[in-house]
């Protein structure tokens, strides 16, 4: 790997436009004394897909870079290479991947270290990404897998000379802080971003043009290959079973969910399905699962998809241990191998086994756990930064890439079989947008989980604020409401045998004690899960926009209007799809402040289960309101005025051949339109450009609702995917 040399601090800069007119530039910083020995390990060299060049070409063409590329400079130091990037005096900065502790990064230092327990606002993250977005309408990616430190206008050089004392008439008392919060508050003090990339003497900087802030994010996602498009069933409800369940108990849970009319598409099995779990054998535990093929067949008969928990550390009893030993790291984790997924041999062995043992037997997804790093607090369980891998990476570089590499290895199994997966992964890095893997965490702070939904949209990531243990009935329902309005509606009940709506107290649940009056709570939970099922067509169309246009499914308000200063600090509201404003209520709140963005009016969402007492209230945009929530069915979700919102009949599962009966809710009196995405919901045939279509819905007060296919001569692969049964004027 290239190292900084003390003989010269000079760095040369070479800027090129990646594709003419498409708004992406690369600035290469290298030592003036010549090419460094070796090449830096980068995310771009291990990306899952090439750039979506045709989609980039459909964006607004950009002739000039959004910042002066010559102003991006570097210098070598003993610690590595230091990069300086200009930042305007009024610009604010967001991004850096899955940041759970803060939204705006201006004035802060962030070190992007992979960490399974990011408990402070330091930059540690399950999925850090060295990519930031400016309110001036551009994005910057520092293409490194090192634990880079970003200083966002937080430091500057001292004054070049002393200053005379103030004249008597000009004297002002010095400000003295009276509390530590004010004393150490982050402040902007310079006009540049400094990025320290340790150990390296060369680095590439990618600049993504807008012209808007959202356009810059879209360009980054499209340059990554376009956003993930999950199978339709992946947007249903997920339920991970108790970790100690055996085959009989898993089948009992499945039948119980169906009998109770609790919507569910995916059942996840936790560590107990394997003979060895820490590290993994990837062998069925025949004592608990004597006939997995029969279990899979029965679950499929009930229209469940099956998702298996695992991690990539390979136990000595695994059938693939010997084949992976030469292509693994030099240090073990839980006595298991750490495969080097940068090597095709390691990927082929690992994927080949999983394909034959599981995917060919109708396992349709995996939960890729423990692929981030140790928590740095209780146990250094993962491989250290000084580990060495046969592909040339050290442990630090591998930690940055491990989640992406692992997910790509598993994703390719399904791509080769032309069958979509939607899975989970606990780590990620740059260029991850195409990967159909959703991030999650063992942490559980409710506000952090909400912030994760918002921040993931800056960097081409998907995040699930999963539901696990709950402190009360209210806590369960409020967490369920947030998770059904996220990229993945996941109930992770691995710690309790009974569904949490029958007993939220973990100890009592494990003791088999039903909660008095559990039926009422189950009914409330069912209504929340059915809301998700109603929104599946809307969400699927939003994911299609993510894939084809790069528009995040969940995004911060500041992305839509960075000039509205109110948006810049809002880290507890987000836009879901094109038209929904979501402001989740935290446990314990009976009222909350909601900001309604300017530019249009907003109408409170309403259906038979939610906001029934308030009704479809209309509010002008550009104002704060106090939303009263006297009961758990009060849900602050607002619809942009003059929107068509397709709501499906709530089915018990989406399945592989759904037919959605749609009622189109009409919000507002002016003309409104919506495009529903149509394909088979299962395959990757949409990638060939001919196996999908858009169903355009239009509402005019005079003529009512009409629909048409937007691409003439191309019928959708499933002509019966949507059946419009009516329209409802809500407000």
What kind of feature is each model-predicted range?
Residues 3-46, 53, 61-634, 639:
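Catalytic-domain carbohydrate-binding cleft regions of carbohydrate-active enzymes
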Residues 34-56, 714-730:
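Extended Gly/Ser/Thr-rich low-complexity repeat segments
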Residues 637-731:
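Accessory, solvent-exposed terminal regions and/or long lumenal/extracellular loops of proteins
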């Amino acid at each position: 790997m290239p190292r900084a040399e003390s003989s010269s601090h000079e760095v040369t800069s070479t800027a090129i436009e990646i594709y003419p007119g498409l708004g992406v530039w690369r600035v290469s910083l290298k030592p003036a004394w010549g090419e460094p020995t070796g090449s830096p390990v980068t995310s771009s060299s291990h990306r899952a897909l090439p750039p979506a060049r045709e989609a980039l070409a459909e964006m607004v063409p950009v002739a000039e870079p959004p910042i002066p590329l010559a102003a991006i400079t570097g210098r070598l130091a003993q610690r590595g290479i230091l990069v300086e990037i200009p930042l305007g005096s009024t610009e604010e900065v967001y991004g850096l991947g899955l940041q759970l502790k803060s939204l705006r990064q201006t004035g802060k230092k962030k070190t992007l270290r992979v960490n399974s327990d990011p408990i402070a606002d330091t930059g540690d993250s399950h999925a850090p990404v060295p990519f930031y977005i400016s309110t001036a309408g551009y994005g910057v990616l520092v293409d490194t897998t090192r634990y880079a430190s970003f200083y966002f206008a937080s430091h500057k050089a001292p004054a070049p000379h002393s200053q005379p004392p103030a004249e008597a008439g000009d004297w002002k008392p010095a400000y003295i802080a009276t509390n530590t919060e004010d004393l150490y508050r982050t402040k902007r003090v310079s006009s540049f971003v400094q990025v320290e990339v340790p150990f390296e003497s060369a680095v590439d900087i990618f600049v993504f043009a807008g012209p808007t802030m959202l356009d810059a994010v879209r360009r980054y996602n499209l340059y990554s290959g376009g956003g993930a498009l999950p199978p339709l069933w992946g947007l249903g409800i997920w339920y991970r079973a108790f970790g100690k369940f055996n085959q009989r108990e898993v089948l009992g849970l499945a039948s119980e969910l169906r009998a109770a009319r609790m919507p569910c598409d995916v059942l996840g099995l936790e560590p107990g399905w394997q003979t060895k779990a820490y590290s993994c054998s990837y062998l069925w535990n025949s004592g608990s699962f004597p006939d997995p093929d029969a279990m899979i067949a029965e679950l499929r008969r009930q229209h469940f998809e099956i998702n298996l928990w695992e991690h990539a550390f390979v136990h000595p009893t695994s059938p693939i241990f010997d084949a992976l030993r030469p292509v693994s790291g030099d240090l073990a984790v839980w006595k298991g191998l750490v495969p080097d997924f940068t090597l095709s041999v390691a990927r082929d062995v690992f994927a080949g086994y999983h394909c034959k043992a599981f995917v060919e037997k109708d396992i349709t997804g995996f939960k890729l756990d423990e692929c981030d790093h140790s928590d740095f607090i209780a146990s250094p369980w993962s491989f250290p930064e000084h580990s060495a891998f046969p592909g040339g990476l050290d442990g630090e570089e591998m930690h940055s890439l491990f989640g992406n590499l692992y997910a790509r290895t598993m994703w390719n199994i399904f791509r080769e079989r032309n069958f979509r997966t939607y899975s989970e992964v606990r780590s990620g890095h740059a260029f991850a947008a195409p990967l159909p893997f959703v991030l999650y965490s063992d942490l559980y702070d409710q506000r952090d989980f909400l912030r994760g939904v918002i921040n993931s949209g800056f960097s081409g990531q998907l995040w699930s604020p999963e539901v696990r243990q709950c402190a009360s009935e209210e806590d369960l329902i409020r967490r369920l409401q947030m998770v059904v309005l996220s990229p993945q509606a996941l109930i992770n009940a691995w710690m309790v045998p009974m569904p949490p709506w029958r007993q939220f107290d973990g100890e009592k649940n494990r003791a088999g004690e039903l909660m008095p009056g559990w039926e009422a709570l189950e009914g409330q939970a069912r209504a929340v899960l059915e809301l998700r099922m109603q929104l599946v067509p809307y969400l699927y169309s939003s994911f299609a926009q993510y894939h084809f246009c790069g528009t995040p499914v969940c995004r911060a308000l500041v992305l839509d209007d960075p000039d509205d200063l109110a948006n810049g600090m809002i880290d507890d509201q987000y836009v879901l799809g094109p038209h929904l404003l979501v402001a989740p209520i935290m446990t314990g709140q009976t009222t909350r402040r909601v900001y309604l963005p300017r530019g249009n009016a907003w109408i409170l969402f309403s259906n038979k289960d939610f906001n029934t007492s308030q009704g479809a209230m209309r509010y002008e945009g550009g104002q704060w309101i106090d939303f009263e929530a006297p009961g758990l069915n009060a849900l602050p979700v607002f619809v942009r005025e003059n929107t068509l919102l397709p709501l499906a009949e709530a089915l018990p599962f989406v399945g592989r051949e759904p037919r959605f009966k749609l009622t189109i809710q009409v919000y507002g009196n002016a003309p409104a339109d919506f495009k529903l995405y149509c394909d088979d919901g299962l395959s990757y045939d949409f990638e060939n450009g001919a196996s999908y279509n858009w169903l355009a819905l239009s509402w005019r007060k005079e003529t009512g609702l009409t629909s048409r296919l937007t691409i003439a001569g191309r019928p959708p692969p499933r002509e019966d995917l949507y059946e419009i049964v009516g329209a409802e004027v809500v407000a």
